[in-house]
Amino acid sequence: MSLDQRGDSAHSVAMTGQQDDFSHLDGIGRAMASVARSPRLTVSVVAGMGIALAWLLLGAIAVRGAVSRLPGTDAPGDTMLRYLPQLPLPDFLARFFALCLAPAPLHASLGAQGGALTAMWLLMAIATMLPSAAPMIRTYCEIADTARIKREPVAHPLVLVAGYLSVWLAASAMLAALTLAVDAFASPGQMLDPAVGIAGAAALSIAGLYQFSWLKEACLEKCRNPFSVLFANWSARPIRIFRLGMEQGLWCLGCCWALMLVMFAVGVMNVFWMALIGLFSLVEKQAAGNLPTRLAGAILLVWAATLLVVST
């Protein structure tokens, strides 16, 4: 009998024995045991907590950014954000926020500021993109659940999520480098302020034009139909599932990378636009047809032209 089979046998005995109610544990212990028995529930809890924590941290950064922004450089929603309380933060979070919001790496190296900005962009990806990846994660959990019923080995769904997020980590590093470049050459004020003039119009134009591209359509088709990709590439090996998660992350990045550029035109830490982009990504991946995508592209192009005319 293999190790996996012995583990399954022991698990079955435990589940059918007198200890399956975990009565010897306290309430928290029983709750944790219930979560641990269900990979699908585990993934839902971890993803939900990650998304909630990401939004909490992003909101705190946005409030501090709105308060510190110079007059005349307000981003949309700053007036409302200034009325929100600035909660006391641990020292390490205060330093992290300072690195994200500072106009230059004052008491830290450029690498430290780049690392902080990478973490900030990754938080944005978790907050806005992970919800739209829920159908893909749920589909994997359903296939994995069916395999477990048949006593087949399965890689944990969190391995798939880790592969997915690794792609966004790499993208976050590139967006952090772009943030530093925009701050050095095109920022009107502090770090993360909205880019104006040609820089802002260029970001909106690229995002708008990409909505009409064949690559956007191909990536969107893959994101809308995860079952065929997951089923065709199914494996019990964690490394294969990690790579599968990376593949799904690349399709998602192909759908949404251009929309991230919109954040440069409205202020990188604009939580209202973050929420709007996250909601649009969710709707776009669930909708049939290209109407939402093309409509968003047209709006972005008109916006870019208007910004360019107003700023000249």
What are these regions (language model features)?
Residues 3, 12-122, 146-149, 187-191, ...:
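Histidine-/acidic- and/or cysteine-rich, low-complexity loops and terminal segments associated
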Residues 43, 109, 113-117, 156, ...:
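Residue-level signature of transmembrane alpha-helical entry/exit and packing/kink sites
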Residues 279-302:
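Interfacial loop-to-transmembrane junctions
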Residues 115-142, 162-171, 210-234, 238-285:
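Functional transmembrane helices that embed catalytic/metal-coordinating motifs
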Residues 64, 305-312:
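Juxtamembrane boundary at the C-terminal end of a transmembrane helix
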Residues 42-58, 163-175, 307:
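...captures the hydrophobic TM-helix bundle architecture rather than a specific catalytic motif
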Residues 146, 150-181:
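Acidic, low-complexity central loop/insert segments
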